[in-house]
């Protein structure tokens, strides 16, 4: 019988690849997405449409509003940087977001009797977010096994799976394509137009386009004219 796993699933390139990997590894995927007050819903709407076709047994959308706290260009009226990927943590970082997301995933996993959680973080082609690093994931995994009834009573050991963490974006894309991922049904842009065209200039678009270029392929999503 397949083991249950909770997959953090935004509808973006990385999380979609992560879902496909979990399925290929024999897990029974339970997808979890978040409506957290993000400035656009294009990614979330794709997640809603894709989760079940990708094999999710259930798809839970958790709603809360991080706009009340602000502090990020993804949740507040702060301009999304378009100058390229820098060395500092950018304003698109959402304070403690992965800790919040993983905490919800941990709660659902414990309820399901699952001990495996997948998250599509990457520490190579990424924007420098602190909650995407291997040491952060290791720390959260330790906490998960100390902070839950299932972990303390020894029913099992929680594992946070990060299959993309040491891959380049090109390697992620190649892996996904080998598993049948349709990247035309994913969204990565931080600042899309009203008709959901990707801007081509934010960190996320730049990393995505770089990945497709290095993989020798054309990104199937639509971009603002002249930005692809």
UniProtKB/Swiss-Prot annotation:
Residue numbers binding ATP: 9-19
Residues that, per the record, bind Zn(2+): 189, 199, 202, 205
CDD domains: QueC-like
UniProt-recorded Gene Ontology molecular function terms: ATP binding; ligase activity, forming carbon-nitrogen bonds; zinc ion binding
Record note on cofactor: Binds 1 zinc ion per subunit.
UniProt cross-references to HAMAP family, sorted A to Z: QueC (MF_01633)
Protein name: 7-cyano-7-deazaguanine synthase
């Amino acid at each position: 019988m397949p083991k249950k796993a909770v997959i953090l699933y935004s509808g973006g390139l990385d999380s979609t690849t992560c879902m496909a990997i979990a399925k290929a590894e024999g897990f029974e995927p339970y997808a979890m997405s978040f409506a957290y007050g993000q400035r656009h819903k294009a990614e979330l709407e794709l997640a809603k449409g894709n989760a079940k076709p990708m094999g999710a047994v259930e798809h839970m959308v958790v709603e809360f509003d991080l706009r009340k706290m602000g502090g990020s260009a993804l949740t507040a009226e702060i301009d999304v940087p378009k100058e390229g990927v820098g060395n500092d943590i950018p304003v698109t970082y959402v304070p403690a977001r992965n800790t919040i997301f993983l905490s919800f995933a941990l709660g659902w996993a414990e309820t399901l009797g699952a001990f495996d959680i997948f998250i599509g973080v990457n520490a190579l082609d990424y924007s420098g977010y602190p909650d995407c690093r291997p040491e952060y994931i290791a720390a959260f995994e330790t906490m998960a096994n100390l902070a839950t009834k299932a972990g303390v009573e020894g029913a099992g050991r929680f594992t946070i799976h990060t299959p993309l963490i040491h891959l380049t974006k090109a390697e992620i894309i190649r892996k996904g394509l080998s598993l049948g991922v349709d990247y035309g049904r994913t969204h990565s842009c931080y600042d899309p137009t009203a008709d959901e065209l990707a801007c081509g200039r934010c960190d996320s678009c730049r990393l995505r386009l770089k990945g497709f270029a290095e993989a020798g392929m054309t990104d199937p999503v639509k971009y603002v004219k002249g930005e692809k």
